[in-house]
Curated annotation (Swiss-Prot):
This is Self-sufficient cytochrome P450 monooxygenase CYP505E1. The gene is CYP505E1. Its EC number is 1.14.14.1, 1.6.2.4. InterPro entries: Bifunctional_P450_P450_red, CysJ-like_FAD-binding, Cyt_P450, Cyt_P450_CS, Cyt_P450_E_grp-I, Cyt_P450_sf, FAD-bd_FR_type, Flavodoxin/NO_synth. Self-sufficient cytochrome P450 monooxygenase that catalyzes the regioselective in-chain hydroxylation of alkanes, fatty alcohols, and fatty acids at the omega-7 position. Performs hydroxylation of C10-C16 n-alkanes and C12 and C14 fatty alcohols; and thereby enables the one step biocatalytic synthesis of rare alcohols such as 5-dodecanol and 7-tetradecanol. Converts 1-dodecanol into 1,5-dodecanediol as major product with very little sub-terminally hydroxylated products with the 1,4-dodecanediol and 1,6-dodecanediol more abundant. Residues 528-669 form the Flavodoxin-like domain. It comes from the Eukaryota. Residues 707-935 form the FAD-binding FR-type domain. It catalyses: 2 oxidized [cytochrome P450] + NADPH = 2 reduced [cytochrome P450] + NADP(+) + H(+); an organic molecule + reduced [NADPH--hemoprotein reductase] + O2 = an alcohol + oxidized [NADPH--hemoprotein reductase] + H2O + H(+); dodecanoate + reduced [NADPH--hemoprotein reductase] + O2 = 5-hydroxydodecanoate + oxidized [NADPH--hemoprotein reductase] + H2O + H(+); tetradecanoate + reduced [NADPH--hemoprotein reductase] + O2 = 7-hydroxytetradecanoate + oxidized [NADPH--hemoprotein reductase] + H2O + H(+). Gene3D superfamilies: 3.40.50.360, Cytochrome P450, NADPH-cytochrome p450 Reductase, Chain A, domain 3, Nucleotide-binding domain of ferredoxin-NADP reductase (FNR) module, Translation factors.
Length: 1091
């Protein structure tokens, strides 16, 4: 908190007052009131008025005594504090004030130099980094991080569930682990795995806490005192170097990756400043990696901690919040769309930040001499501290109950009525928190998930809130107990992975449409111009989507460009569509010149220009909500341009931007275009984007669109099972290139669709298999462009034919149905989508066959289909056992479909089953998670392997590798394999091979037979869980010797195994209990892995 103390002036601004200005300044000095405050003592100033252990509480106490503006003297320097909304409103005027970096924050420059948080005002490195990084925090990019956020939130919930209802949870520590892991994974694709180190924090956190605390202490002590604290200074430098080393390691790890994630770290490494064209230096990259790791988790963990403190102190509010989650989400998986439907959760978080702003202040300084509040004179360069805990409890704004936790005051209808700058926990203006949307989405998700799954009570009902202060604040010593709701068990929690998508991915939609060329578009049609203003890429993505949507109406002669290029360049012979947003109350960087041009009054008459404006915004910025789109719309209309349609808007806080754009397009823009530009009736027949693909017949070609695929030649195939049981197969191949695989690793296989499914498509559209199709599209859709392929190859090798139809697919099919009965049934399917379509895996092809009156062009059908994806399989052959070779063990999925009389054919498994010796397949090696490998010291650490069916695959490679290890005369710790199947002569996979390995002493095999219970080899055990109980003593013996347990199989099997082992062994630490769950839910291939 002493970031607000010890200010020694700033380096940003100097001022010279001379001439007539000096005379006015002297008069203001005479008229100005003295800023109140306690009387300072000689030498020590007001040091004795401040409790250095509780600086925040001390300063708030002074605020209560001395009023909205007061000053104290620390280290010989005056410190000024503003504590009222009225003064903060003035201080947030960026035409008069800018950010000052001073005191504790300035001390952090040793750590992060000119990083986004610690840079001085106007520092060049900050400008470059800020312009490069803003697009990485656009709403679509943030939404794309939802799944990774959910992954880590699940880890937290699973930890609490497994520790049980009697466990006392240090909630602040766990939220610190969560938020640090989240920022590292979501922005840098780097797993810190903090939840697997239960007793200690990650070394980065340990070093960070010391550095933050020491920066705080240094800022509060006189310079002479700091000069003699030599050991503390050395320790601070040591911890700073430790943090920078971790950042370097993250960067080094990323640079080694051949196909890095397209995330914030990738932007740091490869981004270019749109103004200077420069990239960021290595030191600047390190500075900002550290900035994001610190700022990206520290305040969010505090927010979550204070939020749950207030919730458990107010059970009625907690229950109301749980009710909102239950009614909105139920027990389903939380999606990113749900977050906009939880307004009370949003209000709770806002109110928590009002009560306890975790970054308790920010500092500004006047650009020139200013009078504040009409009576206090401030010199240029004088830092003024905005004391948020006092400002956010200003009774003139929040009423006499300002000290009470009352989320209702933060609901949208009340929040929008607050005066300007009443709620500023994320800072101000261009130096406000760049990661606000990231932190908010994470906090909403975590609160919703915890309330969905747990009832919470304080561990100590008599606990009184204590504050732990560094440069941020958190509760000190606050603990809770968490009990699972809905009669859930720890093993039953999260049986389905979290999904950021309901029907479509906003982020992938954005990425898909953004591929369109800025400079090239199909010519020869109606002209249209799209101008966008976009810092984060969102409005650019919307412009591309809208351009794509309008192509079927003949608008194929398209221009897409940034708004600044429209200065004196607005065309008169075509529609002009403008899509933009407001950034900190101002135009986006690429729209500033255009807005300035409109505001200049020098705009020539715009008669003859037909335009429409679509604006994006977020309702939390109440004072500037849609400001720039509205301003552009009004100024263009005032200058004589013709408004084609009422302005469209999209509120990113509560809606899907693309859906809002689509609604405006259909209800406002298209009717206006029809009327003004006389669209033909033939265009009107295609309102649903059916003809984005333009098709002609030509010659065929083969697949080459996937990266990192290598060729492999099949050498051996065999069936492993009796004809009376579901088929399992073995396929062996030789790699046509070098690999670095280890036992337990995987390969991604590029399959083709089953021939019978392809024939259904050809029959549906009356195509011969050898027809040639050429796709000429303004959007790539992941398909070969302007290159002929045969119809059979296109539907075999490029697209998913069995993927469940989306709601949007159903909408299009309903719109093209000729029969009213079919139309109504398709609408009904939209209303019951989850149960009747998604869960039954009803594909677009299934629907076309079911509803023959649907008249869907083949181009529209192709555009509905996702690109064919790779399938992941676990290798069942150790590289050391047979170099340059690999093998797969898989179940062939051929079973009754859930939605009718047809058979459901797994794409990957049926493709592999069709291969014969000599066949070529394309695959890419994929390492397993690090924990799912053999121990480094196989001579000391025993292993226990547990699996069923084709889950044996990775363990076969483990055993083979152990065989090689033994043949090299190396000692081996004991290995136990528990294997479940139907019966000895049904599907006891690799029985002979395993018997040989057993005879060699490499492994001991313990079987369970589900269909032949009286066979002695299984000792009457039906499932592996039963065999585990029967072998309890052997398991406990190996567990006592530090054994590692590996589990591979279906989710149900793994859940049952975990339940048995927890009874036998107690708590299962993740580093010694490793699972791989194959994805039964897809019904595509039971050897596909969730890893």
């Amino acid at each position: 908190m002493s970031m607000l103390l010890g200010v020694r002036g700033t380096r940003d601004q100097s001022s010279y007052i001379g001439g007539r200005d000096y005379v006015f300044w002297q008069k203001e000095m005479r008229d100005a009131e003295r800023i109140p405050g306690p009387t300072p003592l000689p030498v020590v100033g007001n040091l004795f008025d401040i409790d250095l252990e509780h600086v925040l509480q001390s300063v708030i106490g002074l605020a209560n005594k001395y009023g909205p503006l007061f000053q104290i003297t620390i280290n010989g320097e005056k410190q000024i504090f503003a504590t009222s909304q009225a003064l903060v409103d003035e201080l947030c005027d960026e035409s008069r004030f800018h950010k000052a970096v001073a005191s504790g924050l300035e001390n952090l420059r040793m750590l992060a130099h000119d990083g986004l948080f610690t840079a001085y005002h106007g520092e060049r490195g900050w400008g470059i980094a800020h312009r490069i990084l803003v697009p990485a925090f656009g709403p679509l990019r943030i939404q794309s991080m939802f799944d990774d956020m959910g992954d880590l939130a699940q880890q937290l919930c699973l930890k609490w569930a497994r520790q049980g209802a009697s466990n006392s949870i240090n909630i602040t520590d766990d939220f610190t682990r969560l938020t640090l892991d989240t920022i590292a994974l979501c922005t840098m694709d780097f797993r810190l795995n903090s939840f697997y180190n239960n007793d200690t924090m990650h070394p980065f956190v340990e070093s960070m806490l010391y550095v933050l605390r020491e920066a705080d202490v240094q800022s509060a002590l006189p310079g002479i005192a700091n000069s003699v604290r030599i050991m503390a200074h050395r320790r601070m430098l040591k911890n700073i170097e430790a943090m920078r080393t971790i950042a370097r390691d993250i960067i080094h790890d990323r640079r080694k990756k051949e196909n890095p994630a397209d995330d914030l770290l990738n932007t740091l490494l490869n981004g270019r400043d749109p103004v200077t064209g420069e990239g960021m230096s290595d030191e600047s990259i390190i500075d900002n990696v550290i900035t994001f790791l610190v700022a990206g988790h520290e305040t969010t963990s505090g927010l979550l901690s204070f939020t749950f403190y207030y919730l458990v102190q107010h059970p009625d509010i907690l229950k109301k919040a749980q009710k909102e989650v239950d009614e909105t989400v139920g027990q389903a998986q939380i999606s990113v769309q749900h977050l906009a439907e939880l307004p009370y959760i949003d209000a709770i978080l806002k109110e928590s930040l009002r009560m306890m702003p975790t970054a308790p202040g920010f500092t500004v300084t006047p650009k020139k001499a200013e009078t504040l509040g009409g009576k206090w004179l401030l010199n240029a360069g004088q830092p003024i501290n905005v004391l948020l805990p006092a400002c956010l409890r200003d009774r003139s704004i929040f009423g006499p109950n300002a000290d009470e936790f009352s989320p209702g005051r933060m609901l949208a209808e009340n929040f929008s009525k607050l005066p300007p700058n009443s709620w500023k926990p994320f800072g101000n203006g261009e130096r406000s928190c760049i990661g606000r949307a990231f932190a908010w989405q994470e906090a909403q998700l975590v609160v919703a998930m915890i309330l969905q799954n747990f009832d919470l009570v304080p561990d100590d009902p008599s606990y009184t809130l204590r504050i732990k202060e560094t440069l941020t604040i958190k509760p000190d010593g606050f603990r809770v107990r968490a009990t699972l709701r809905h009669r859930q068990t720890a093993t039953g929690l999260f049986q389905h992975t979290l999904s950021a998508r309901n029907d479509t991915s906003l982020a992938s939609s954005s990425a898909h449409f953004i591929k369109k060329s800025e400079d090239q578009a199909p010519a020869g049609g109606r002209p249209i111009c799209f101008f966008y203003g976009s810092n984060s890429g969102t409005c650019k993505a919307l412009a591309h989507r809208l351009a794509s949507d309008l192509m079927p109406y003949g608008f194929t002669d398209q221009k897409l460009a940034v708004l600044d290029t429209a200065v004196d360049n607005l065309p008169r012979d075509q529609p002009v569509i403008i899509l933009t947003t407001t950034y900190d109350g101002q135009p986006t960087d690429d729209a500033k010149k255009f807005v300035a041009w409109l505001e200049s009054g020098k705009v020539p008459a715009l008669q003859g220009i037909s335009y429409a404006v679509f604006g994006c915004g977020h309702h939390d910025w109440t004072q500037t909500f849609y400001r720039i789109p509205t301003l552009i719309d009004e100024l263009m209309h005032k200058a004589g341009a013709t408004r084609l349609a009422p302005r469209g808007t999209a509120n990113a806080a509560v809606s899907d931007l693309f859906s809002d754009l689509e609604a405006w397009e259909e209800t406002s823009l298209l009717p206006a275009l029809r009327e003004t530009f006389l669209l033909s009736s033939s265009s009107d027949l295609e309102p649903l984007n059916l003809h984005q693909l333009q098709i002609s017949l030509s010659k065929p070609r083969r697949i080459d669109l996937h990266k990192d695929l290598m060729e492999a030649r099949v050498t051996t195939v065999r069936i492993l099972t009796n004809p009376d049981t579901p088929e399992k197969r073995h396929i062996e191949f030789r790699f046509q290139g070098d690999t670095t695989l280890r036992p337990g690793d995987h390969v991604n296989v590029l399959p083709v669709n089953p021939p019978s499914t392809v024939l259904r498509v050809l029959a549906q559209f009356n195509l011969a298999p050898d027809y040639s199709i050429t796709i000429n599209s303004f959007n790539t859709l992941g398909l070969p462009q302007a290159t002929p392929v045969s119809a059979s190859e296109l539907f075999s090798a490029y697209v998913e034919l069995s993927q469940p139809a989306t709601r949007n697919n159903l909408r299009i099919l309903a719109a093209t149905a000729q029969s009213d009965e079919d139309k109504q049934e398709l609408i009904h399917l939209q209303d019951s989508y989850d149960s009747l379509v998604r869960d039954k895996r009803v594909s677009v092809l299934d629907l076309l066959e079911q509803f023959p009156s649907v008249s869907l062009p083949i181009a529209a059908f192709i555009s509905m289909l996702p690109a064919l994806r790779l399938r992941t399989y676990s290798l069942s052959l150790a590289p050391s056992f047979k170099p340059s070779h690999g093998s797969l063990t898989f179940s062939v999925v051929n079973e009754p479909a859930r939605n009718g009389n047809r058979r459901y054919l797994g794409v990957g498994s049926n493709y592999l089953a069709s291969l014969t010796p000599g066949s070529i397949l394309y695959l890419s090696p994929r390492p397993a998670k690090e924990a799912f490998h053999l121990p480094v010291d196989q001579s000391r650490i025993p292993i226990i392997m547990i699996c069923a069916g084709s889950g044996l695959a990775p363990f076969l490679s483990f055993i083979q590798d152990r065989m090689i290890w033994q043949q090299q005369d190396k000692p081996l710790a004991r290995a136990l394999l528990f294997f479940g199947c139907g019966g000895r002569f049904l599907d006891d996979l690799y029985h002979e091979e395993l018997s040989e390995f057993e005879a060699a002493g490499v492994v001991d095999v313990r079987r369970a037979y589900s269909k032949v219970l009286d066979y002695d080899m299984a000792r009457g055990c039906k499932y592996v869980q039963d065999r585990l109980v029967a072998e309890a003593n052997a398991i406990r013996h190996l567990w006592a010797q530090d054994a590692t347990i590996y589990v591979c199989g279906s989710a149900d099997m793994a859940k049952g195994v975990e339940g048995v082992l927890e009874k036998l062994l107690g708590m299962l630490p993740r580093e010694r209990y490793v699972t791989e769950i194959y994805q039964m839910q897809t019904r595509d291939n039971v050897s596909e892995w969730l890893i």
